[in-house]
Amino acid sequence: MQTPPESTDVKLDTLNEPSAHLIEKNVALPKDIFRSYLSYWIYEIARYTPVMILSLVIGVLVLLIIFFNDNEACVFNSAIFAFTSLVGLLIILSDGNPKLVSRRNFRTELLVDVITRKPAVEGKEWRIITYNMNQYLFNHGQWHTPYYFYSDEDCYRYFLRLVEGVTPKKQTATSIGNSPVTAKPEDAIESASPSSRLNYQNFLLKAAEIERQAQENYWRRRHPNIDALLKKTE
């Protein structure tokens, strides 16, 4: 397994840095660090405390069954507890999106970063956003490693689920680009308090507007004649 470059320690709290494109090239995500998704998955599981505890319990119970196989009561009770622990372990392993990562402060942090950077569909900005979110989860104790999102695609899919069903007010690309953003990424935790629910909804609507415009730009680049095709179907 490779080690992340020292440049990943660069602070990316603002977008005022003139060399943002250079920072993006040096940001290392888990998919760049690990040889495969399997090695990444094993690394994450091995550092997840509930998994380690349950694995240790199962191991001890199996040893009890082996060494005390002539004691029916011990074997029976150990087998019951081992089976229960195994079920719990499988439930934890199958939980790919823990509740910790659905906390309002994290979602607000993600929305503010999207609003600030205005990423394109499949844009390089998503690498920086993903790196920031991984660092945020780790630094705030919401995840046990700084590698929650394996790739920028994973973070982007999470964002799409977040804004799914949100109907933004239709704006032009110019109006979106010129709209003032009064919130800063470091203010996201405060904005996520229960008394600031309206701010969160505003962030959600704004991020949905940016994503809608990014989708329009993406499909227009891929199909320059899309407007003519749409007129024919009317």
Curated annotation (Swiss-Prot):
Top-level taxon of the source organism: Eukaryota
Subcellular location: Endoplasmic reticulum; Golgi apparatus; Cytoplasmic vesicle, COPI-coated vesicle membrane; Cytoplasmic vesicle, COPII-coated vesicle membrane
Positions in coiled-coil regions: none
PTM annotation (Phosphothreonine): residues: 3
Pfam families per the UniProt record, alphabetical: DUP (PF00674)
Alphabetical list of InterPro entries matching this protein: DUP/COS (IPR001142)
Listed GO CC annotations: COPI-coated vesicle membrane; endoplasmic reticulum; ER to Golgi transport vesicle membrane; Golgi apparatus; membrane; plasma membrane
One GO BP: vesicle organization
Keywords: Cytoplasmic vesicle, Endoplasmic reticulum, ER-Golgi transport, Golgi apparatus, Membrane, Phosphoprotein, Protein transport, Transmembrane, Transmembrane helix, Transport
Region (COPI binding): 231-234
Bilayer-spanning residue ranges: 48-68, 73-93
Topological domain spans for side Cytoplasmic: 1-47, 94-234
Membrane topology of the entry: Multi-pass membrane protein
Keyword flag Transferase: no
Signal peptide feature range: none
Stretches in topological domain Extracellular: 69-72
The keyword Iron-sulfur appears for this protein: no
Family, similarity comment: Belongs to the DUP/COS family.
Job description of the protein: Involved in protein trafficking vesicle formation, probably by stabilizing of coatomer at the Golgi membrane and thus allowing the efficient formation of COPI coated vesicles.
Subunit structure: Interacts with MST27. Binds to coatomer proteins of COPI and SEC23/SEC24 of COPII coated vesicles.
Further details from the record: Members of the DUP240 multigene family are specific to S.cerevisiae sensu strictu. Cells lacking all 10 DUP240 proteins show no obvious alterations in mating, sporulation and cell growth.
Name of protein: Multicopy suppressor of SEC21 protein 28
Taxonomic placement: Eukaryota, Fungi, Dikarya, Ascomycota, Saccharomycotina
